[in-house]
Amino acid sequence: MVPETSDLLLEIGVEELPASFVEAALRALPELCKKRFAELRLVHGDVHAYGTPRRLTLIVEKLARHQPDLEEEVTGPPVKAAFKDGAPTKAAEAFATKLGCAIADLRRVETPKGEYLVGTRREVGQPTMAHLPAALVQMTLAIPFRKSMRWGAGTVAFGRPIQWLVALLGEEVIDLEIAGIKSGTTSRSHRFLRGPGVTPNGEVTITNAATYLDTLRAAHVIADPEERARLMRERLLSAAKEAGGVLIEDDFLIHENLSLVEEPHVIVGGYEKEFLELPERVILEVAKGHQRYFGLRSPDGSLMPNYLAVVNTAENPALIRRGNDITMRARLSDARFFYGEDTKTPLATRREKLSGIVFQKRLGTVLAKAERIERLARELGLLLMLPEPTLMAAASGAHLAKCDLVCLMVGEFPELEGEMGKAYALKQGVSPEVAAVIKEHYSPKGAGDSTAASDAGALVAMADRLDTLVGCFAIGLTPTGAADPYGLRRACLGVLRTMLDRGFDLRLTDAFRAAYDGFALVKLDLSRDDLVKKLGEFFSDRLKGLLEAKLPSDAVQACLAVVSDRPLDARARAEAIAHLDAATRAGVGEVFKRATNIAGNAPAGEPGMPADEAHPSEKAAYQAFLALRERLGHLARSGDFDGAFRDIAAFAPLLAQYFVDVMVMADDLKLRESRLRLMRAISETCGTLARLDLLGG
């Protein structure tokens, strides 16, 4: 018999929640629901969470209207504790009482831990409605907020005061109460806008979960965040077109505005053209960082003296625009003042002020760090044998790289670090190549950001991150769990991505040693060798994850087991192995696993030529190996890993047949030793390219 089901709706109406509170609640609600309903044995379909600043909503599809009966086996106390001299003890009596059965109904069961009493717990399922009030109250009060508040004389804590509750199973009201608010069918429309079916004071009746989104949409509330985001983008594009411009799209701003409005409306604002004399990025940052406004470009690509603001109402647009314009002009005026003051002083002369900023109390000031970066960038360039002009550009860029940190503009807009350094450098006559280094050395800023576009910028970017990594690791400031205050994981990935993107074939150990030497005047906790070992493991873990995002895991692990110190080399080998299909990799892995295991007992030395009477498979494998060994040496030296692994894959079936036809551990000790040497030679020769025994795992 198919159980009867109904859709569940819970809407928690609140005073305006901060955007981050809405997002956190919508992440938590479905999991809280699934967990509680699992505990109650309530079967259900899909679970959805919707929300705006004024409401958090849970919809559960096809919730069973009745619990199933429960019958489960429960293990109780050990028999030796349950009975004494044949009579039941209090332990046995308590266990029987818990299960609601007689002691005679309990069974003795032998387990690995001894003999235990076992009984059956039976529970008749109850109507779902009997459990829902308490369950929904529990879920609601379990929603995590960064900071909760109490209101009135009550003791309930929530993100913001609860204003109304709608709770329905099908079309039946679930009777519950939280903080003096009783549930019903009455929700609220948009705070300022009304629609059909909405009372003058903004009340709207919800009849069931199926029509909930449509009912609110008619009341100017877009409860589904995904729908709200789509509508916001459509209206932004439309407003930009009407203004004669092109929207500067920004997913971050869509996300930022999403939980600030219940129905997105767009207003076009503007400011004086004179402000366009500021660097474009400054204007966009003023609009984005402080106001959450979108920028506009003219069809020719130049910035327009306009912005788009997402607002929560279509009423009084002129009044809203006037207020927004006043605020935008004030912010731009501040930025123009900062820019004017900053450009009065050459960037290079600001460098000494970096001595007043502490990078890390044991590792010194930002000036000390800047000096280490300048030295290290050249060391890395020499290790990579880059041309002298690149080294000079890197050195000049590194010298200026941190100077904008003491500028007024960066003090107000930290997101513009590097960007302003580049702008000021260009304005003061620094070459474009050097100015670009100032900006590029902050790249990548995150997983979605590109790495430095020039070799000089890449050198300084790597030097900056390596200095931080080596310094922090050397004084014990390593990431622990989710805590990574110095962003060391991100810095590590930045170094690796830069090396791979620029094609820098650099040994990590050489880079670590060069960076460590820059701390000669700092008392460190780790020796250079210990630092290199510990940081090498940290990098290897990150490199593994980076490569496995695009390449088969077995190929990556096989290569990192051999060349984790050279990321570019490791990637090239893993890519070559990945060109072999999964079945081929598995076959190679299987035969080399066997060869490697056997080789562990093998003596050193050149394998002997098989005797004339040897099995053809033994002769074929031996001759093929000699040819393979010669080819692999040439292919590896030339970097032709595709050819090398193709040859190994072609050799694998011969080795597999060898194992079928030949007994390696022959009774003849001399013959056994020769065959063992062959296994060792095969394993060691091919093992210089990758741990082939790890393939196919």
Predicted regions: what is each one?
Residues M1-G697:
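Amphipathic alpha-helical "coupling" segments that flank catalytic cores
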